[in-house]
Amino acid sequence: MTEAMKITLSTQPADARWGEKATYSINNDGITLHLNGADDLGLIQRAARKIDGLGIKHVQLSGEGWDADRCWAFWQGYKAPKGTRKVEWPDLDDVQRQELDNRLMIIDWVRDTINAPAEELGPSQLAQRAVDLISNVAGDRVTYRITKGEDLRDQGYMGLHTVGRGSERSPVLLALDYNPTGDKEAPVYACLVGKGITFDSGGYSIKQTAFMDSMKSDMGGAATVTGALAFAITRGLNKRVKLFLCCADNLISGNAFKLGDIITYRNGKKVEVMNTDAEGRLVLADGLIDASAQKPELIIDAATLTGAAKTALGNDYHALFSFDDALAGRLLASAAQENEPFWRLPLAEFHRSQLPSNFAELNNTGSAAYPAGASTAAGFLSHFVENYQQGWLHIDCSATYRKAPVEQWSAGATGLGVRTIANLLTA
């Protein structure tokens, strides 16, 4: 084992020999990060990425100034999906150390799960991993039900069944109930709904290779809300929350769904399929119907839903949609507290009517006449939320995954959004 490289913090500028804006310097004792008070967490994260790029795989965070947030910023930049890294953490008080350990356990689970190859992580495996994580932090306060394959069709989950039937791996619905009260009649405070498409080829509306090569990550919404519930539990969540994960592959086969098919949902809505690559909203609809039936105060769905959100925001922000201004403000306040990037995009009543079909009540995709793809996708989902004007948040997870490394992130999953949703649940 190589000796650890010491990483220390300083509020003094680097020696002029390192350059006017140097963020780190190297000396006989190790590496010093020079904080300027403007964006210290970002500076630490970017420096960690550079340190990893130097091939330094064993570090010791040493000296004064380290807390849970700064340690976590370092780890966010240092962690990468390939190779191993070791960090010797500084002395923290018990509360700070527990917070850091919980982030390392849960958000690393989210990142590693999203990064897993689709061959290893099918719908059933994703559902079981979610159960295992929540059970690990909640113990006997959790019950769950897994419904799969033809049982989904028999029970009316037609969106999930239709999308997933083209794969040899059966589609799965996970319904998990975290009930710390022990009272089976306790009201449900919140429902979390996640898109769990474990691989998305686009179906017969097939993706080009350049857009398909990262589609193992199309279950990022499911991983994010699972991590958020687990993290909220570690922060003392004392209200009943239900989790619905809609898990499937979207593949091509003789049994796969086709353009022009019409799906009839349990709430009576009929949807014409005009793009099999707009499948995420079709599976989420089933989860949102179940969530609405619980009559919760709060419904949050999360999905890697549209390329339009990425076009608007890149991979730097999650896109937020809601008709409920006060609730959207609460989510954005939680994001600010957790130093996670969210940006609200438009969602208006007219977006709900921008999905016309000649053969059904709704089309599953907008047309050239209505190009606001992320907003019309949110508008589509609103048709499956009973009281869509209050208590509902839709997160289009554009910041979940990066195909290529940047100055603060390695390639792969980021884990962003977990802490924000957990913060909102425990506020």
From Swiss-Prot:
Q: Which reaction does it catalyse?
A: Release of an N-terminal amino acid, Xaa, from a peptide or arylamide. Xaa is preferably Glu or Asp but may be other amino acids, including Leu, Met, His, Cys and Gln
Q: Which domain of life is it from?
A: Bacteria
Cofactor(s) annotated in UniProt: Mn(2+)
Keywords in alphabetical order? Aminopeptidase, Cytoplasm, Hydrolase, Manganese, Metal-binding, Protease
GO terms for cellular component: cytoplasm
Q: Name one GO biological process term.
A: proteolysis
Gene Ontology molecular functions: manganese ion binding; metalloaminopeptidase activity
Q: What is the cofactor note?
A: Binds 2 manganese ions per subunit.
Pfam families the record matches: DUF3663, Peptidase_M17
What EC class is this? Answer: hydrolase
Active-site residues from the entry = K207, R281
Has UniProt tagged this entry with the keyword Hydrolase?
yes
- Residues that hold Mn(2+) 2 according to the record: K195, D200, D218, E279
Q: Which residues bind Mn(2+) 1?
A: D200, D277, E279
- What Enzyme Commission number(s) apply to this enzyme? 3.4.11.23
Q: Where in the cell is it found?
A: Cytoplasm
Q: What does this protein do?
A: Probably plays an important role in intracellular peptide degradation.
UniProt family annotation: Belongs to the peptidase M17 family.
Subunit (UniProt): Homohexamer.
- Recorded protein name is Peptidase B
Q: Which organism is it from?
A: Escherichia coli (strain SMS-3-5 / SECEC)
